[in-house]
């Protein structure tokens, strides 16, 4: 057990992205701000000029928004990143040879704390959304088909991989959601170009093992918000100029941590007996070294920004 509070005097909160989105919409509604939903063909344009704008279609009608700056918060598959010229942008990527099969179940979680399991059959994770909604994952091959996994098959495999005390007490039930997601690490540099600033998954992706995706998006927003505040209130562009550097410094540390968590707790197809011994030793060291636990804990709760 890694006591995050004792090791860092901080804690983590399980804050599902659905709930985050709901809360943000409620705040925006109270502020009477305008959100344009169901926009199509969104495209930032002229971001290398003093008059950038964004075009999009709404109900078949083309619209145009003039602006000072553009924040590209449109995710990994969004259009914003492609606006940066190929001669300027550089991408770094690691695709992992497995995925996560996850289910959402209207059952009480097996534990109030997250359980990470390294098993001969592969990784497993016991998580939660709330006291009546559980989220569980198991590692599967990339070519696995979701149709091959009945609820019962999933529960049987999960129980094999979890510690005995958890497997014996877990409450099973019908899944209300089931999916398989690939794992990858991805970073693009720079995270800004002229009047365009990439935020969150538009600029970087981490495997979910380290629980850093949303945490990184929030720190990007913090850096950009601080830069925008200085730009408009103090009329200085230093924050905007340094946005990419500041954000990437924290991004790469989270990329490293998520990579380490993934390689430590997953089984790789090409894993040799030597690799297995190294992995076993890594976990044993983590179990017995307070120094190692502190390194994991301070990264898991999120590095400062």
Task: Tell what function each PLM region has.
Residues 1-31, 46-48, 255-258:
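Active-site-adjacent segment of FAD-dependent monooxygenases/related oxidoreductases
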Residues 6-7, 138-142, 202-203:
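Short, histidine-centered active-site or binding-site loop motifs used for metal coordination
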Residues 13-18, 148, 215-218:
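Short, solvent-exposed loop/helix junctions and linker helices
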Residues 24, 71-72, 179-260:
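Conserved mid-domain beta->alpha element of the FAD-binding
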Residues 26, 33-183:
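Conserved FAD-binding catalytic core of PHBH/FMO-like flavoproteins
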Residues 30-31, 120, 194, 246:
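Structured helix-beta-strand junction loops
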Residues 211, 226-305:
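C-terminal helical "tail/cap" subdomain of flavin- and related membrane-associated enzymes
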């Amino acid at each position: 057990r890694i006591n995050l509070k004792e090791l860092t005097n901080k804690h983590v909160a399980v804050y599902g992205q659905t709930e985050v989105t709901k809360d943000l919409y409620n705040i925006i509604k109270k502020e009477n701000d305008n959100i344009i939903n169901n926009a199509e063909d969104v495209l930032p344009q002229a971001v290398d000029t003093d008059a950038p704008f964004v075009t999009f279609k709404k109900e078949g009608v083309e619209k145009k928004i003039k602006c000072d700056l553009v924040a590209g918060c449109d995710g990994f598959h969004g259009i914003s990143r492609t606006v940066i010229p190929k001669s300027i942008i550089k991408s770094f990527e690691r695709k992992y040879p497995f995925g996560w099969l996850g289910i959402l179940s209207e059952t009480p979680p097996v534990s109030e704390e997250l359980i990470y399991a390294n098993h001969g059959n592969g990784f497993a994770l016991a998580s939660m959304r709330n006291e009546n909604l559980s989220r569980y994952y198991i590692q599967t091959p990339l070519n696995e088909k979701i149709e091959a996994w009945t609820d019962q098959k999933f529960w049987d495999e999960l129980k094999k991989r979890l510690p005995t005390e958890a497997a014996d007490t877990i409450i099973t039930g019908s899944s209300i959601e089931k999916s398989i997601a690939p794992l990858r690490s991805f970073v693009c540099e720079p995270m800004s170009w002229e009047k365009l600033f990439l935020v969150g998954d538009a600029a970087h992706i981490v495997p979910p093992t380290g629980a850093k995706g949303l945490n990184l998006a929030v720190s990007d927003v913090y850096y950009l918000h601080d830069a925008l505040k200085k730009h408009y209130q103090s009329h200085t562009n230093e924050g905007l100029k340094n946005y990419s550097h500041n954000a990437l410094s924290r991004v790469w540390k989270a990329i490293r941590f998520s990579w380490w968590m993934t390689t430590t707790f997953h089984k790789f197809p090409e894993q040799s007996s030597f690799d297995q011994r190294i992995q076993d030793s890594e976990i044993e060291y983590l179990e017995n070294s307070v120094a190692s636990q502190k390194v994991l804990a301070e990264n898991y709760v999120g590095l400062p920004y």
